[in-house]
Design a protein with these regions (language model features):
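N-terminal [4Fe-4S]-dependent radical SAM core
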Residues: 5-88
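Core AdoMet radical
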Residues: 57-73, 77, 81-101, 116-129, ...
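Acidic (Asp/Glu)-rich catalytic clusters
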Residues: 82, 109-115, 137-146, 181-182
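Distinct, well-ordered alpha-helical segments
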Residues: 101-109, 130-141, 161
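Short, surface-exposed connector motifs at secondary-structure boundaries
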Residues: 114-120, 186-189
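Conserved strand-turn element in the central/C-terminal portion of the radical SAM core barrel
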Residues: 158, 180-197
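Basic, amphipathic alpha-helical patches used to engage nucleic acids or provide basic targeting signals
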Residues: 174-180
């Protein structure tokens, strides 16, 4: 009871994402996590090896899902969510822009073609968002879909970025965010509170 009351009070002061979606869509909208079978350039040797020090692959969408089609994953995830009937397809695991644009287009299209999908959330690194990917995301935005580019910033301090083995600097994040905003894309920044340094 107390926690619910506190959240209700907080919603009066803060524009929370879930509340914003409910206001705009007239009903609850839930993110359904997807595994696109992507890798990460900080794991496969393109940028580095071993990944970021904090990366916990087990926290991503169920690894078993990567062998299911996008449609099957969405149906499975939707069955787990009782309170929502509209969804955002959330490409979360690894680096969800680390593929050829044709591959991304196919995956994103499979997602938005499913019933009750109102948009895409694409989790990625700021150094893995070339112009062609931004343009692809704009295509979906221009078709009326809710599109969020979710960038893993983690920290704005270059020393800490190096310490956690990110493989990019803060300036890279700033450039990518600027390019996304110039195209009218919404950006969600992922931060880790309490990193050393």
């Amino acid at each position: 009871q107390g926690a619910v009351y506190q959240i209700m009070q907080l919603q009066k002061l803060v524009n929370m994402f879930g509340g914003d979606l409910t206001r705009r869509y007239g009903q609850k909208v839930h993110k359904l996590t997807l595994h696109g079978g992507f890798s990460c350039p900080n794991r496969d040797g393109t940028i580095g090896r071993g990944g970021c020090t904090f990366c916990n692959v087990a926290s991503f969408a169920d690894e078993a899902q990567q062998h299911r089609s996008i449609a099957e994953q969405l149906a499975h995830q939707a069955n787990l969510v009782n309170r929502a009937k509209r969804y955002l397809a959330y490409f979360q695991a690894y680096t969800s822009t680390f593929a050829e644009v044709q591959v991304l287009r196919s995956m994103y299209q499979q997602a938005v073609s499913q019933a009750n999908i109102v948009g895409l959330c694409v989790g990625t690194r700021p150094d893995c968002v070339p112009d062609a990917v931004l343009d692809l995301l704009c295509e979906y935005k221009d078709q009326g879909y809710e599109v969020w580019l979710e960038l893993g910033l983690q920290t704005a301090h270059d020393k800490t970025l190096h310490r956690i083995n990110r493989g990019h600097d803060f300036a890279c994040y700033q450039r990518t965010t600027q390019l996304a905003r110039e195209r009218g894309l919404k950006v969600c920044s992922h931060l880790i509170v309490g990193l050393p340094g």
